[in-house]
From Swiss-Prot:
Keywords: DNA damage, DNA recombination, DNA repair, DNA-binding, Nucleus. GO terms for molecular function: ATP binding; ATP-dependent DNA damage sensor activity; DNA binding. Involved in the homologous recombination repair (HRR) pathway of double-stranded DNA, thought to repair chromosomal fragmentation, translocations and deletions. The lineage of its organism: Eukaryota, Viridiplantae, Streptophyta, Embryophyta, Tracheophyta. Signal peptide: none annotated. This is DNA repair protein XRCC2 homolog. Belongs to the RecA family. RAD51 subfamily. GO terms for cellular component: Rad51B-Rad51C-Rad51D-XRCC2 complex; replication fork. It is found in: Nucleus. Gene3D superfamilies: P-loop containing nucleotide triphosphate hydrolases.
């Protein structure tokens, strides 16, 4: 090996000046409600815990749309980050069509008013087009839609080995996207505990065969955490991971025992007194130490009080466990299939808008925060 080859081999990937310019330009950013209480920085790992059908994937989709949307486009403010989203689907139930429909509605929302204040939209403006397809043709920006969808990288994994393989190739995929001018922003995992039981069974079978080379459940998770740490060292991104719950009480005792008035309880000005998480932790300690922020979502015990008109809306409560905040956010999820007038749901915390096209097979939800 000659001197030139040796120098090229030990040459760093970037200079100290390049490294500082890359790190210092990454500022904290806020996601849309209900993930807006804590500013997130590159390197943060947010764990969103909740039972099945607790709108965890819905929250990820809304956060992904806010990430892939640009801040402005042709003079219209969209309020996005304009960054790349990496979505690892471990549940294998992600519906790309729902992402597409929600993105189109988000674009229409901004185009209708041009300033994002779409709750001021009148009923006559909503019914100016006969169908959702006509709205898409008349107001929809296909070029912007295509550029946003290109920033969404979707990977489906069926077991832990495929997850490890995908994590090892993500660095190369990110480099390809960055070469095209797209900077990575968020890595989403839905959900991190999807393979827990299969890996646990495989570990038991490996112990019976006395095969030392077989990976145990703990070793698999440790390897996954190591690969994620490598990505965080090289790329400036935030990790959002959902996790299901097991052996969780329907309405935890710590929530029912809060001695507050009904007004204070609804406004969210209450503090959680529980020091332990209200669910059974099943992930290994390596993952628990890797997580920097923790959120739990529950079905609200007083969901029957959250009604608009004749519709019983599903209500959920979102609580920050790490860092522990004294405020509990509440949001609603609607599943209306017919075209309705845009009607906001007012509370002291969140303002939820529902826009459902008549031809859509999926519900579309948007959340906007009121000044409190």
């Amino acid at each position: 090996m000659g001197d030139d080859e040796a120098r090229s081999w030990i040459r760093g990937d970037e200079t100290a000046k390049q490294m500082l310019s890359r790190v210092l330009k990454d500022r904290a950013f806020l996601l849309i409600p209900p993930l807006h209480r804590v500013p997130l920085r590159a390197g943060n790992v947010v764990e969103i815990t909740g039972a099945s059908t607790s709108a965890k994937t819905q929250i990820l989709i809304q956060a992904a749309i806010s990430c892939i949307l640009p801040k402005t486009w042709n003079g219209i403010h969209y309020g996005g980050l304009g960054k790349l989203v990496l979505f690892l689907d471990l549940d294998c139930r992600f519906d790309v069509l729902r992402l597409s429909q929600m993105l189109k509605h988000r674009l229409l929302q901004a185009n209708w008013l041009g300033n994002g204040a779409w709750w001021q939209l009148e009923e006559s403006n909503v019914k100016s087009c006969k169908s959702a397809e006509e709205k898409t043709k008349t107001v929809f920006d296909e070029e912007l839609y295509a550029s946003c969808m290109k920033r969404f990288l979707y990977v489906r994994c069926y077991d832990s080995l495929e997850l490890l393989s995908s994590l090892k190739t993500l660095h190369y995929r990110i480099q390809q996207q960055e070469a095209c001018g797209s900077q990575v922003g968020v890595l989403m995992i839905d959900s991190i505990g999807a393979f827990h039981w299969t890996d646990r069974l495989s570990s038991s079978l490996a112990l019976e065969t006395h095969n030392r080379k077989s990976l145990s459940l703990t070793n698999v998770v440790e390897t996954i955490v190591q690969e994620l740490k490598k990505l965080l060292l090289v790329h400036s991104l935030v990790v959002l991971a959902t996790k299901g719950t097991i052996y969780e009480e329907k309405y935890p005792a710590n929530e029912n025992n809060r001695k507050v008035s009904s007004n204070d309880h609804f406004s969210g000005n209450v503090a959680s007194k529980a020091q332990q998480p209200p669910f059974r932790e099943f992930m290994p300690s390596s993952w628990q130490a890797f997580v920097t922020h923790k959120i739990i979502i529950r079905k609200s015990a007083d969901y029957q009080s959250l009604q608009t008109g004749q519709q019983n809306l599903l209500a959920y409560s979102l609580e920050w466990l790490q860092p522990q905040l004294s405020r509990i956010d509440r949001f609603i999820v609607d599943d209306v299939r017919k075209l309705t007038t845009i009607k906001p749901f007012y509370s002291k915390l969140l303002l939820i808008y529902i826009v459902i096209p008549a031809s859509s097979s999926h519900a579309v939800w948007y959340c906007h925060c009121l000044v409190t």
